[in-house]
Amino acid sequence: MGRAVGIDLGTTNSCIATLEGGEPTVIVNAEGARTTPSVVAFSKSGEILVGEVAKRQAVTNVDRTISSVKRHMGTDWTVDIDGKEWTPQEISAQILMKLKRDAEAYLGEPVTDAVITCPAYFNDAQRQATKDAGTIAGLNVLRIINEPTAAALAYGLEKSKEDERILVFDLGGGTFDVSLLEIGKDDDGFSTIQVQATSGDNHLGGDDWDQRIIDWLVGEVKNKYGVDLSKDKIALQRLKEAAEQAKKELSSSMSTTINMQYLAMTPDGTPVHLDETLTRAHFEEMTKDLLDRCRTPFNNVLADAGISVSQIDHVILVGGSTRMPAVKELVKELDGGKEANQSVNPDEVVAIGAAVQSGVIKGDRKDVLLIDVTPLSLGIETKGGIMTKLIERNTAIPAKRSEIFSTAEDNQPSVLIQVYQGEREFARDNKPLGTFELTGIAPAPRGVPQIEVTFDIDANGIVHVSAKDKGTGKEQSMTITGGSALPKEEIDQMIKDAEAHEADDKKRKEDAETRNNAENFAYQTEKLVNDNKDKLSDDVAKSVTDAINELKDALKGDDIEKIKAAQEKLMTEAQKIGQALYAQQGAEGAAGAADSGSANNGGDDDVVDAEVVDDDDKDNK
């Protein structure tokens, strides 16, 4: 019988742990380290390298080295290596296989079962991809559990206090999660850990802080040498490694020096050297907006749980990125001035918690009960494009819910079940998970057939859906498999703030009309200037053109008020065109004035109203 392990499959680093005598132990890898870089490389000879050895050769093998693949999980992203398309699941499986091999060498016995962690805010496709990676690696995946939950599990085992409410602030290399949990322990030492709420951002992590340093260094080189390194893959890889190191050094020092020789060559053959000093203050200034993105999930969790900051006993920091001083200060600010609890190792605590859960599932530990939640609501599209939710977010899992629906037309022979995940009121604004059809419905007037739709979320957070015609007994079901069905750009987090989204929905039509009107006005005014260049003075043409360009620049952004202001300015400037044309034509006499009136009427024809889409049409789209 093989051993069970817990694996933290991270964006930047991964970690594996197991139970020894009922207690969790981190397993060191073949290189003697307790964490393994989540990097996979393919050597020119075809050998697959994983971990530190892959990371070390990245500069000389840029195109065949893959890092941060976790950010692509659940998408259709692939990388071509020697004619083979590698999916994120397959790349991740190579990391898991390395961890599995090292664990087997350490333990001296086969490793067969694993609990693998994923961000709490991973959607169904991303969770399924994580499970698939484990299967490809030859592991029996006992469970997919959320990283903050695993961290709380590890933390809770050491606590003697009977009841504690903790908030896990998990900022890793590529993802960010916040989870609120209650930990209780009875007189017999039995621990109950229950998740109350969770929120996050699947595209926020230490990689983004690194990228800001890289962008700054690229800009410095361009300013000094006139060389653009943004297309130089080898130079970028060197900058990436230097940026990561600089970020780490700034966690303990107020400044750091980045010194790199022979980064590139100028067109005249001069070597490009880099010698820059980056202060912590400058680093924090250039990443302030990233830090601010951590606020909303924190506040959302408190709102969803219906508690105040004062009701949190401890905030636990998880993930290597929480070592940054600015992050610690933010947590202190959000937590009402209290210092965060730093009693756990942020790099290892998730794997330790996963190992404990593997022991619970295998029966090696019987003193823990873990109750997790689904981070996003699940539902189907009903008439009018409405998202009808069957399972609300933050529902404890496993969970099963059923609801009766009917047909929308007389004698309707089938119904299309379209499954979505998210918090928006309209299905089109949420993430599609899958579609299936229930056929063979007996002829009947609309509203008479009874179609029972059932959602079942297993302990992994993976969704199973079924539909049954209660009249005929016919049934159709599906397991959401995710993966390549979801485009990359649609893996962004699915919920920010439900109230904010409602406000966005109400403003959407107004904002769209404002933008359309502004675009049309800019186009028509520019056309009028071009058609009458010989009749306008240079000053008038320039002032109007400048206003047109200002409006165009505003239209590139999302600030509606800025667009309105720019349009009003252009309307004022555009009046000068009419004044100039009237003045010129007035000088030509009465006939000219008549022509001017005709031209003015023609000018009205140039104004194009924005298209108005009928509400019924919108619902049918």
Curated annotation (Swiss-Prot):
Stated induction or repression of this protein's expression: By stress conditions e.g. heat shock.
Modification Phosphothreonine, positions: 175
Top-level taxon in the UniProt lineage: Bacteria
SUPFAM superfamilies according to UniProt: Actin-like ATPase domain, Heat shock protein 70kD (HSP70), C-terminal subdomain, Heat shock protein 70kD (HSP70), peptide-binding domain
InterPro entries in the record: ATPase_NBD, Chaperone_DnaK, Heat_shock_70_CS, HSP70_C_sf, HSP70_peptide-bd_sf, Hsp_70_fam
Biased segments, Basic and acidic residues type: 499-516
UniProt xrefs under Pfam families: HSP70
Stretch list, region Disordered: 499-520, 583-621
Swiss-Prot/TrEMBL keywords: ATP-binding, Chaperone, Nucleotide-binding, Phosphoprotein, Stress response
CDD domains: ASKHA_NBD_HSP70_DnaK-like
PROSITE patterns the UniProt entry points to: HSP70_1, HSP70_2, HSP70_3
Annotated GO MF terms: ATP binding; ATP-dependent protein folding chaperone; unfolded protein binding
UniProt biased composition (Acidic residues): 603-621
Sequence ranges of Low complexity compositional bias: 583-602
Entry's family note: Belongs to the heat shock protein 70 family.
Cross-referenced HAMAP family: DnaK
Role this protein plays: Acts as a chaperone.
Protein name: Chaperone protein DnaK
Lineage, broadest ranks: Bacteria, Bacillati, Actinomycetota, Actinomycetes, Bifidobacteriales
Gene from which this protein is expressed: dnaK
